[in-house]
Design a protein with these regions (language model features):
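Inward-facing hydrophobic residues that define packing positions of alpha-helical scaffold repeats
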Residues: 9, 16, 21, 27-29, ...
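Intrinsically disordered, low-complexity, charge-biased linker/tail regions
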Residues: 1-3, 10, 66-93
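A structural signal for the main folded, soluble domain(s) of proteins
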Residues: 20, 42, 50-53, 85
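TPR/TPR-like (Sel1-like) alpha-helical repeat modules
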Residues: 33, 47-68
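Start-of-helix register in tetratricopeptide repeats
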Residues: 6, 36-39
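Solenoid-like repeat scaffolds
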Residues: 2, 25-35, 62-66
Length: 93
């Protein structure tokens, strides 16, 4: 099984956690149409304050538009992506 950071969405999130917006954005752009990457893409645009663009990417990812704390959202995304990368399935995945 691949390590969690081997997934594009988690690699992008790791770049965002380092403050490397452009690197994170490039990763998700290269994986446009993959729901996990689209979710991180939405987060990135919300982080930069581009709420209209963020809303578009939340819709593409099949997610509700986030409105709460950015750090809490990032933690939620990380936990969900790590569950997925770990191969877990079911209602909590």
């Amino acid at each position: 099984m691949a390590a969690p950071s081997d997934t594009p969405a988690l690699r992008a999130l790791e770049q965002a956690e380092r403050g490397a917006f452009e690197a994170a954005h490039e990763i998700v752009q290269n994986h446009e149409g993959e729901p996990d990457c689209d979710w991180v893409h939405a987060y990135l645009h919300r982080w930069e304050g581009d709420h209209d663009n963020a809303a578009y990417w939340y819709r593409r990812a099949g997610r509700m538009v986030a409105r709460g704390d950015l750090a809490a959202e990032r933690a939620e995304i990380r936990a969900a992506l790590e569950r997925i990368a770990g191969g877990r399935t079911g209602p909590d995945a």
